[in-house]
């Protein structure tokens, strides 16, 4: 992790949907979604590998239920909507497959992300990995009975409607200290919006499944007082956000804030030097010590059992990640917080993570050290600092 980062080269992506051809399951009498005005998203291709589709259908309910329990939600029924993919402006896919998770009201509650294993970095032996988080669920719910295209770049995600204006709907941490335009024009000559097929992301593709049994069988362990009090904006303070939320949780307080943490450690920095500074592991450990904790550095990902024991003992864990796509730029190194862990009804072990860019938690296979995040990048979990 570095204090000062060179400028990150923005990668423009297009976020569009790709689905597996499937019979209109909405006609099934067992599907009772009230919503009939579906979100229509322009797509290029509706194909999804059989292995990916089967994995999503087999495991989505277990992963979703783990987050429901973390959020203290009641038992519910869910199904999958039509899946989608994310493309760059040149129409090259980012390689992931995304499945909306629908509730019985026809709204999207979560997004299932299935990624091919990154052989060079991943410790997982499986062909694909699966993660679940809220991601773009609230955004998609706002466009019922509309036809849209979704674009993304380093500034965030944009919805493009019939007027070909891209409205910013979800910000991600960005580089430039400038005000974002609420609408932007699509680049001239760009044909990403001229996609021939459409996907109905709120259309059920199978019968709804109750998570009653799954809910009762799952083991959930969480830092009792962990809450998302603030999220990261246009700065390099991921470690500050991570430590402040972990300490707020383990001390059951609201007094820690990312900016104050960064100011404590960098009292003499001003302007953009302060705004875009980061922290080293040594600085993170030092700050924990000044707050009455004894953080320890572990040069690897924590195991499921380690997370389970530390969380039970009210000791917070910071994830230290290295971006797989590029080792250069502002977010080449990134810190995240461990919220807890879960053992699913199928026996699979997962770790619950909070990324300071997000307003929700995400699941992570406990045997996979590559974490997909909400801006399309992947981070290799190479070290941990535990004891906050």
Curated annotation (Swiss-Prot):
Propeptide: 26-214
Source organism (scientific name): Staphylococcus aureus (strain COL)
Top-rank EC class of the record's enzyme: hydrolase
Note from the entry: The catalytic maturation of ScpA appears to reside outside the cascade of activation started by the metalloprotease aureolysin (aur).
Alphabetized UniProt keyword annotations: Hydrolase, Protease, Secreted, Signal, Thiol protease, Virulence, Zymogen
Free-text activity regulation comment from the record: Prematurely activated/folded staphopain A is inhibited by staphostatin A (ScpB), which is probably required to protect staphylococcal cytoplasmic proteins from degradation by ScpA.
PROSITE patterns: THIOL_PROTEASE_HIS
Superkingdom of the organism of origin: Bacteria
Primary localization class, coarse: secreted
Site feature (Cleavage) residues: 214-215
Its job: Cysteine protease that plays an important role in the inhibition of host innate immune response. Cleaves host elastins found in connective tissues, pulmonary surfactant protein A in the lungs, and the chemokine receptor CXCR2 on leukocytes. Proteolytic cleavage of surfactant protein A impairs bacterial phagocytosis by neutrophils while CXCR2 degradation blocks neutrophil activation and chemotaxis. Additionally, promotes vascular leakage by activating the plasma kallikerin/kinin system, resulting in hypotension.
Documented EC number(s): 3.4.22.48
Family recorded in the similarity comment: Belongs to the peptidase C47 family.
Gene: sspP
Subcellular location: Secreted
InterPro entries on file: Cystatin_sf, Papain-like_cys_pep_sf, Pept_his_AS, Peptidase_C47, Staphopain_pro, Staphopain_pro_sf
Subunit structure, interactors included: In the cytoplasm, prematurely activated/folded ScpA forms a stable non-covalent complex with ScpB.
Native organism taxonomy: Bacteria, Bacillati, Bacillota, Bacilli, Bacillales
GO biological process: proteolysis
Full protein name: Staphopain A
PTM note: Cleavage leads to the activation of ScpA probably by an auto-catalytic manner.
């Amino acid at each position: 992790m570095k204090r000062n980062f060179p400028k990150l080269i923005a990668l423009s992506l297009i976020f569009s949907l790709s689905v597996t051809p499937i019979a209109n399951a909405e006609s099934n009498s067992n599907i009772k979604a009230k919503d009939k005005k579906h979100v229509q998203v322009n797509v290029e291709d509706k194909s999804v590998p059989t292995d990916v589709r089967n994995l999503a259908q087999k495991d989505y309910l277990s992963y979703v239920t783990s987050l429901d329990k973390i959020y203290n939600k009641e038992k519910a029924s869910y199904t999958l909507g039509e899946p989608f993919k994310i493309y760059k402006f040149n129409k090259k896919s980012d390689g992931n497959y995304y499945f909306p998770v629908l509730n019985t009201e026809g709204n999207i509650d979560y997004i299932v992300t299935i990624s091919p294993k990154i052989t060079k970095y991943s410790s997982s032996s499986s062909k694909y990995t699966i993660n679940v988080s809220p991601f773009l669920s609230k955004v998609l719910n706002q466009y019922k009975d509309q036809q849209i295209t979704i674009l993304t770049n380093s500034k965030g995600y944009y919805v493009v409607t019939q007027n070909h204006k891209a409205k910013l709907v979800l910000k991600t941490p960005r580089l430039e200290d400038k005000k974002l335009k609420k609408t932007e024009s699509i680049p001239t000559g760009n044909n990403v919006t001229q996609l021939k097929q459409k996907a109905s992301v709120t259309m059920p593709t199978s019968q709804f499944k109750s998570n009653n049994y799954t809910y009762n069988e799952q083991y959930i362990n969480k830092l009792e007082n962990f809450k998302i009090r603030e999220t990261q904006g246009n700065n390099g303070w991921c470690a500050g956000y991570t430590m402040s939320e972990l300490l707020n949780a383990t001390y059951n307080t609201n007094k820690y804030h990312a900016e104050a943490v960064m100011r404590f450690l960098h009292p003499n920095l001003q302007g953009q030097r302060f705004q875009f500074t980061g922290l080293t592991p040594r600085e993170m450990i030092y700050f924990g010590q000044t707050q009455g904790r004894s953080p320890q550095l572990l040069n690897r990902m924590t195991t499921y059992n380690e997370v389970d024991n530390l969380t039970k003992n009210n000791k917070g864990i910071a994830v230290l990640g290295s971006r797989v796509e590029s080792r250069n730029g502002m977010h080449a190194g990134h810190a995240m917080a461990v919220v807890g862990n879960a053992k699913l009804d199928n026996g699979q072990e997962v770790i619950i993570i909070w990324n300071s860019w997000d307003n929700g938690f995400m699941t992570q296979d406990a045997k996979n050290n590559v974490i997909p995040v909400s801006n399309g990048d992947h981070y290799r979990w190479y070290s941990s600092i535990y004891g906050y």
